[in-house]
């Protein structure tokens, strides 16, 4: 048990033979799909890949030595189906290829709880529904496995039809290498809501907006765009690495006294109580399903809003400056 009372499960807590004794169909061969499939195979698990006939990933999966079937064929053949296509595509893939090929005793696994949490997918009775969600992108999941390390994960049980779903989740987590680092049990609801909040308020949305505003403030005050880029974006990795290694305290210990003092007196003025209130509103939209409904509605109508927002973000001046600088310096090659 950890000091905060949350149990961290490691390799000694899992029986790898459970996942080795079933056929796993990995549906999708993108970031998580390719990493989890390769790691499972290297752990002695029988894996087939399910991809549409026109999928751009078919050749990559075949070149990696996998048997590649159509999604419905893979789902019918396997006892555990790992659905690793992007969230917006999962409903259609489930309805067209998986739903009618599930048998009692099968297991349906996700690496994000979005479609279960918001009711876009409702698996039938008699089927285990579980989640193993690595806390890192696919290339990291694969790289850490090959380096005899692991990427931490969370896991959850939504429906334990077989009575062995908990053990199966841990076995799968061990198969992809996650238990080398450790896994924490959660729920589909907790994983989905906290993951979306982290992405929107801090890791992606909040951080990107903070970087852009910092860049704009310096450039509008007359400083060189290149210098502004270094100060508010490039050096961010140095700080993030310190935080990941040893928490906020290691970052504070490692920076200069000037920087540390400035962070205390100025940080709360930038990220003030109004920011926290806005964060609470965002969390409320996530918990109520408002965000999910907006996202899926836009996706279903052609992703017009998403496309427009992506194009606007790509036109920000920091992108051109960054591309030019990265082309000049050896650290980007």
Swiss-Prot record:
Reactions catalysed according to its record: (2R)-2,3-dihydroxy-3-methylbutanoate + NADP(+) = (2S)-2-acetolactate + NADPH + H(+); (2R,3R)-2,3-dihydroxy-3-methylpentanoate + NADP(+) = (S)-2-ethyl-2-hydroxy-3-oxobutanoate + NADPH + H(+)
Associated pathway: Amino-acid biosynthesis; L-isoleucine biosynthesis; L-isoleucine from 2-oxobutanoate: step 2/4; Amino-acid biosynthesis; L-valine biosynthesis; L-valine from pyruvate: step 2/4
Cofactor note: Binds 2 magnesium ions per subunit.
UniProt keyword Magnesium, yes or no: yes
Membrane spanning residue stretches: none
Catalytic activity, EC: 1.1.1.86
Residues at which Mg(2+) 1 binds: 195, 199
Residue sites binding Mg(2+) 2 per the record: 195, 231, 235
Active site: 112
GO molecular function, one term: NADP binding
GO cellular component, one term: cytosol
Family stated for the protein in its record: Belongs to the ketol-acid reductoisomerase family.
Protein's UniProt name: Ketol-acid reductoisomerase (NADP(+))
Native species: Tropheryma whipplei (strain Twist)
Gene coding for it: ilvC
């Amino acid at each position: 048990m950890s000091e905060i009372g949350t149990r961290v499960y490691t390799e000694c807590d899992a029986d790898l033979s459970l996942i080795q004794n079933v056929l796993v169909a990995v549906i999708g061969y993108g970031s998580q799909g390719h990493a989890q499939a390769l790691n499972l195979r290297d752990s002695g698990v029988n894996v087939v890949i399910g991809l549409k006939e026109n999928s751009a990933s078919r050749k990559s999966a075949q070149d990696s030595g996998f048997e590649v079937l159509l999604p419905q064929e893979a789902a019918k053949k396997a006892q555990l189906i790992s659905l690793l296509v992007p969230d917006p595509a999962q409903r259609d893939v489930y309805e067209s290829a998986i739903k009618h090929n599930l048998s009692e005793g099968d297991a349906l696994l996700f690496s994000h709880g979005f479609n279960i949490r918001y009711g876009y997918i409702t698996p039938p009775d008699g089927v285990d529904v579980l989640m193993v969600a690595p806390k890192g992108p696919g290339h990291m999941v694969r790289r850490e496995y090959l380096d005899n390390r692991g990427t931490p994960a969370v896991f959850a049980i939504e429906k334990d039809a077989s009575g062995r779903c908990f053990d199966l989740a841990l076995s799968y987590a061990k198969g992809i290498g996650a238990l080398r680092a450790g896994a924490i049990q959660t729920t589909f609801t907790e994983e989905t809501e906290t993951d979306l909040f982290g992405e929107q308020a801090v890791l992606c949305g909040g951080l990107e907006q903070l970087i852009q505003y910092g860049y704009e403030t310096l450039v509008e005050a007359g400083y060189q765009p290149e210098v502004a880029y270094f100060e508010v974006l490039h050096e961010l990795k140095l700080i993030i690495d310190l935080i990941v290694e040893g928490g906020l305290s290691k970052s504070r210990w490692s920076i200069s006294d000037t920087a540390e003092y400035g962070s205390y007196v100025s940080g709360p003025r930038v990220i003030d109580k109004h920011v926290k209130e806005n964060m609470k509103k965002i969390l409320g939209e996530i918990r109520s399903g408002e965000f999910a409904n907006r996202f899926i509605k836009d996706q279903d109508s052609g992703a017009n809003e998403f496309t427009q927002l992506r194009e606007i973000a790509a036109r920000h001046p920091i992108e051109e400056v960054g591309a030019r600088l990265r082309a000049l310096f050896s650290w980007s090659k």
